[in-house]
Amino acid sequence: MRKLQSANILAALEAHPAFRAANTILLYHSLGDEVDTHTFIKKWSSEKRILLPVVVGDDLELRIYTGPDDMTTGSYGIEEPTGEVFTDYAAIDFIAVPGVAFDRKGNRLGRGKGYYDRLLPRIPSACKAGICFPFQLVEEVPAESFDIRMDIITVSYTHLRAHE
């Protein structure tokens, strides 16, 4: 069920005009309870520059995905690329953002460590897409004025344009 739902969500994501136009995309290597991105990363790595986050202390460092052979198990049991560090944040066109919950205003609830809260302000011009299963779309997520909202939420077969 998770694999099928993930495939449907990611099919909607890749059909979005902002994704189609993007050259450099920040994805994430999913955990067992998240939308499964493993096959999606491999699929798009031959057509677009794919970046994946690596946990370094209290921050996320971005690295270029070069293939499954260059992955290692990092913090929290997450597979992370060992390739080149990427620091040209202005070149990132699109970001797929994981979360525990999202609301229709684009607010996101993460896992509580603040990694994306610290990363996203460095990438203001990229389209930010929260991707989630239907049960993760909730009425309201608590948000502070400094929280970065998602531009779109991709759930099931469709996108919800985040708005106030």
Regions found by a protein language model. Name each.
Residues M1-A90:
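N-terminal active-site beta-alpha-beta segment that forms phosphate/nucleotide-binding
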Residues N23, D93, D151:
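Conserved acidic residues
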Residues L27, V97-P98, V155:
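Redox-cofactor binding/interface segments in oxidoreductases and associated redox assembly factors
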Residues D36-T39, L62, K105-R108, E140-V141:
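Short glycine-/acidic-enriched loop or helix-start segments at secondary-structure transitions
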Residues V54, I64, E80, C132-F135, ...:
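Short, structured patches in soluble enzyme cores that scaffold and shape functional sites
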Residues A91-K128:
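Active-site beta-strand/loop microenvironment that shapes enzyme catalytic pockets
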Residues Y116, P121-V155:
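Structured adenosyl-cofactor binding patch, chiefly the S-adenosyl-L-methionine
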Residues T158-H163:
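Conserved small/polar residues in nucleotide/adenosyl-binding loops
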